[in-house]
């Protein structure tokens, strides 16, 4: 392997600090598999992409799911934690804040074939590439990023301190209970909890809980779980009840969704 290839293709446990470089764009490529980045932030903007597997991104007050073949834009200074499962063809690009991208909010976007090729090429750039040689493709990237279709894979967390212990349980893998159970758990009446969720998330608790279950279902399907496993974990009374729920919220079945996000065979 060439020196350039060795520098761009890294192992999950290799030390890497994107903020130590001064080039406009720094890219890396890796086969992450299972990895937990821990909570951190960058001085640069970051774009994450993977061809297969799922990435859950925890923010201070939100949860994001990054499905395969989408990209997430993370503005500089955003504290986040990326939890990866079965991730293949992981690509991460880091952008100087001097580039015309600073107005972009955190978002998940669809990646079309041209955008993918741009991401792929930049991920394997030599870290010593002169800035002048990066200019033309950076221009294409900016055009594609600004034109990319944004998708809603984010769930806001409530910020009321009465729910902090409960939220920590969710982050540890617990499922949100029914409203009457949550009321007993946190010691607040159902009406109060409803007001908190409307105020902090724009959704009532029942809708918020359904959205949480939907994102968890998509995460598990992206990880290769069978429909029956997902239905049982999310406490549906039957596989058919889960399939109906999934179709109602996405317009497709879990089976078709899984087929569309699995790695494409050559």
Kindly give the residue locations of the regions a language model identified.
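Terminal helix-turn-helix DNA-binding modules in bacterial transcription factors
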Residues: 199-239, 243, 259-266
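…primarily DNA-binding HTH/wHTH and HhH modules…
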Residues: 2-3, 15, 244-266
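Ligand-binding loop in jelly-roll beta-barrel domains
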Residues: 77-106
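Short, Lys/Arg-enriched, Trp-marked, Pro/Gly-tolerant hinge/linker segments that flank
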Residues: 126-189, 199-211
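Short hydrophobic/aromatic patch on the recognition helix
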Residues: 69, 193, 197, 241-242, ...
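Residues within the helices of the helix-turn-helix
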Residues: 179-180, 228, 244, 255
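Short acidic-glycine-tyrosine-enriched beta hairpin
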Residues: 61-76
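Generic protein-terminus/edge-of-domain signal
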Residues: 1-54
């Amino acid at each position: 392997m060439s020196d350039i290839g060795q520098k761009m293709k890294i192992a999950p446990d290799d030390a890497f600090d994107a903020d130590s470089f001064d080039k406009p764009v720094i890219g890396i490529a890796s086969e992450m598999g299972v990895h937990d980045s821990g909570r951190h932030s960058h001085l640069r903007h970051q774009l994450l992409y993977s061809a297969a597997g799922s990435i859950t991104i925890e923010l201070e007050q939100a949860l994001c799911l990054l499905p395969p073949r989408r990209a997430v834009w993370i503005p500089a200074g955003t504290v986040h934690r990326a939890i990866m499962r079965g991730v293949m063809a992981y690509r991460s690009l880091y952008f100087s804040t001097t580039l015309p991208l600073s107005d972009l909010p955190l978002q998940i976007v669809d990646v079309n074939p041209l955008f993918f090729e741009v991401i792929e090429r930049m991920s394997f750039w030599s870290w010593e590439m002169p800035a002048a040689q990066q200019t033309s493709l950076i221009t294409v990237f900016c055009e594609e990023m600004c034109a990319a279709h944004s998708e809603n894979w984010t769930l806001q967390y409530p910020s009321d301190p009465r729910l902090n212990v409960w939220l920590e349980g969710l982050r540890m893998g617990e499922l949100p209970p029914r409203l009457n159970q949550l009321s007993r758990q946190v010691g607040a009446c159902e009406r109060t909890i409803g007001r908190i969720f409307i105020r902090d998330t724009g959704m009532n608790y029942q809708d918020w809980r359904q959205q949480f279950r939907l994102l968890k279902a998509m995460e598990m399907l992206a990880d290769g779980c069978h429909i029956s496993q997902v239905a049982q974990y999310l406490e549906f009374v039957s596989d058919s009840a889960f399939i109906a729920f999934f179709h109602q919220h996405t317009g497709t079945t879990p089976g078709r969704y899984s087929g569309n996000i699995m790695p494409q065979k050559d």
